[in-house]
A protein has these predicted regions:
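Acidic, divalent-cation-chelating loop motifs in proteins
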Residues: 295-299, 326-332
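Structured interaction patches on ligand/partner-binding surfaces of diverse proteins
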Residues: 268-296
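Beta-rich interaction/scaffold domains
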Residues: 1-185
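Compositionally biased low-complexity segments at domain edges in trafficked proteins
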Residues: 191-195, 287-316
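Structural motif
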Residues: 189-205, 210-217, 299-305
Length: 356
């Protein structure tokens, strides 16, 4: 006979009238007992100690059921592969996305969950402790089999550490599942100045990054000839790009996921400067140096010539109050199209776009 103690505090007794009588008497404690001619059965009311997850689905994008071709939904495989008894996971993300969706699936639906994630302010910026280095965290309740969107730390700002705490029905048993989202990155930096606007201290431009493989589907760079008018700029506008404005002094430093990129230095009314097929590995720093952007390519066809001059003359001596004022011809940003703009275009006449 087994003499080990057995906790029956979570059990109750219920009379069962559908089975033969037994005449057994059960003493629950000194005062209470059950004695009945009919049989009885135990009812287990013990709270569950199951604090397991059956699965953790990490995804991005959305599903379009009406037009599946428009769906962007994608699931990611964790390292190691998910198992209820494995508590620590990593995900290396090689995409330029800002958010991930977490969908935890409970083993016991009577359990509850909380998600601990980096804290952000109303503008979506990371909140740091008083030392300005350590990131603050916050907790929120999350639901079983429901996706929760998590904003990721920006490239260069460290891993995104997430913890899902599962509390069993008994309120005591807990399991902490951690997910560390790693975002490898490299850096592209450089500076630009606008010719001939150096004396005006005008440096602002936009740096546009394109995945080289996507550009190759649209543009064959081997066929592009210097000094020939083309629609390269307009074709690039149709391709998804990662855009960053330069600082006020023309410098820029952009964090990117490893890959091969085409880089466009762009400002309205100025000749483009393009770099093609630049590969960035994890930890790389690509410095493109200081580059000039030349005022005068009003129609963005890669050459400053007669068509641009004609467009300037058509808006000559107009200002921001005029109906035909065109900001892209106002090269020095003074709100007027006049002699300074004409002089800038003539100084750069017949200059061609540069592709490196």
């Amino acid at each position: 006979m087994i003499s080990d103690d057995f906790d029956i505090s979570g059990f109750s007794l219920k009379e069962d009238e559908l089975v033969p009588t037994t005449g057994i008497k059960i003493n629950l404690n000194v005062k209470d007992s059950i004695e009945n001619k009919s049989a009885f059965r135990f009812v287990d009311a013990t709270a569950s100690k199951n604090a397991n997850l059956d699965n953790l689905i990490v995804s991005s994008g959305t599903t379009d059921e009406e037009n599946p071709d428009n769906s962007t939904y994608k699931e990611y495989e964790l390292n190691p592969k998910f198992d209820k008894d494995t508590l620590n996971y990593e995900l290396e993300l090689l995409e330029n996305i800002d958010e991930l969706n977490l969908k935890p699936i409970l083993s016991d639906t009577k359990s509850s969950m909380k998600l601990k994630k980096p804290k952000r302010d109303e503008d979506g910026n990371l909140v740091y402790e008083s030392d300005g280095v350590i990131v603050e965290y916050e907790e929120l309740d999350i639901q079983n089999n429901v996706s929760t969107t998590v904003k990721l730390n920006e490239l260069g700002k460290g891993d995104t550490n997430l913890t899902i705490t599962v509390t069993a029905e008994d309120g005591k048993t807990e399991k902490n599942y951690t997910l560390v989202v790693k975002r490898p990155y490299g850096v592209i930096r450089g500076s630009i100045f606008l010719k001939p606007m150096e004396s005006k201290k005008i440096y602002k431009a936009t740096v546009r990054l394109y995945k080289s493989d996507e550009v190759k589907n649209v543009i064959d760079w081997s066929t592009v000839k210097s000094g020939k008018r083309d629609s390269i700029h307009q074709q690039l506008e149709k391709i998804t790009s990662l855009d960053s404005d330069t600082n006020d002094d023309g410098t820029f430093e952009i964090y990117v996921t490893p890959g091969t990129y085409d880089i466009l230095l762009d400002r309205e009314g100025y000749l483009d400067h393009i770099f093609i097929s630049r590969t960035i590995n994890n930890g790389d720093v690509l410095d493109v140096g200081e580059k000039e952007l030349y005022a005068g390519d009003v129609n963005k066809d890669g050459v400053i010539q007669l068509l641009d001059l004609s467009m300037l003359y058509s808006a000559y001596q107009t200002d921001t109050t005029s109906a035909n004022y065109d900001k892209k011809i106002d090269f020095n940003d003074d709100g007027r199209i006049q002699l300074l703009d004409l002089s800038a275009l003539k100084a750069n006449y017949e200059v061609n776009r540069i592709i490196e």
